[in-house]
């Protein structure tokens, strides 16, 4: 990591169908279907919409043998329609399904947390991928580490890295380099730390696999875009990332413009900003520079604060260097002027530029100077950036998955309904998850959870504890509100 100037991390080339990532190629954007993988027409239509929007890589879940075999029909239909989209299978739990999927798709994603390896399954999959020219993604999820790793390391960034490196070492020993790796979490601080630790671990073992970036369960609307931009932007500012997915609880094609905006935003970052005291900074250890309890926004009193404004095309490096070079313990407000006219563009760019300074404990206040926007609109964006960076909580936080073919209900409508009933509960975190694969783990720090258990059935959580199982979906929202009331966390709107 170069603290003084922007440079992309060197990585090897990996071919995913027609798309090549790593090796200095442009950062690729991608998405994932949320249709039933057994529904060939619906999946093909959604893949084609994503491709037309600019997403050249599309992933589908294959949770069983039937879904794995139907990938052949989906790929065939997409090709017949004239699309050469790179198609990826997402596998959990069943190595046999990975072997089926590898016969048809361009890349297979497996999760070390739930992929069996005791009988040479990984080596067999590598051999199959090599023979067919199929790429492999080692995709670690914070919410689904194996029991063995969890018992030793807990659900920590270090545990995520241990999980990934075990699989990457097998790939290296097999001489297989068509590998991509990811370290996803809904917690931006965990996610950024995990990726940075992974890069350190790979560098130490001379590994140069391309990296797939993403924040899981970011939610929807402007909040979801800001949360993704804070996490992904923090790493892209470090030069990390060869392909990205902005996970939103919306139509998958809505993710593509946000991802493309981030790629374009980091495409050119000139300027060199020497850091005189690099010992004051650790990319993998969170520590606050000051003891300011609650970071401020620009409309709040800033007596005794030092305001530092970025004026270059590389605001993150400029501000970081200026803060690290300060010879005063005064708290710092970071300021940046934007000429944007779109609220979404302003929010994404500001989150990508400034969020990392709070993730790293360097900044104590945020000031977005945007003449085209009302003060209240700017203030709301600033507060959402601080919340996404996990330094100040000012509104209800929703940990909501983007949904996929495993999702057991209409998650977009459900999230909207949950928000309409609970958005006034400012100090709560509420998880709304499509299924049990990553749901309970990814929402582990949520106060309450709403998780799909079976078609038309919902399980409710208080923290990590199941409170009610298999509730009829039509009753689940009222029961969630009752659960919040029963635990003393409800206030009248």
Language model segments and positions:
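Active-site mouth loops of central-metabolism enzymes
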Residues: 24-42, 61, 85-93, 113, ...
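Alpha-helix-loop-beta-strand connector modules within alpha/beta enzyme cores
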Residues: 65-89, 125-134, 198-207, 268, ...
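N-terminal amphipathic alpha-helix/helix-capping segment at the start of soluble metabolic enzymes
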Residues: 1-31, 130, 268-299, 416, ...
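Hydrophobic or amphipathic alpha-helical targeting/insertion segments
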Residues: 85-87, 92-137
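Glycine-rich, proline-tolerant flexible connector loops at the mouths of alpha/beta enzymes
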Residues: 34, 52-78, 112-117, 179-188, ...
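Conserved, mostly hydrophobic/aromatic
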Residues: 29, 90, 138, 181, ...
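Catalytic alpha/beta core domains of metabolic enzymes, predominantly
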Residues: 141, 149-286, 303-432
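N-terminal small/glycine-rich loop or linker at the start of catalytic domains
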Residues: 11-35, 71-72, 137-152
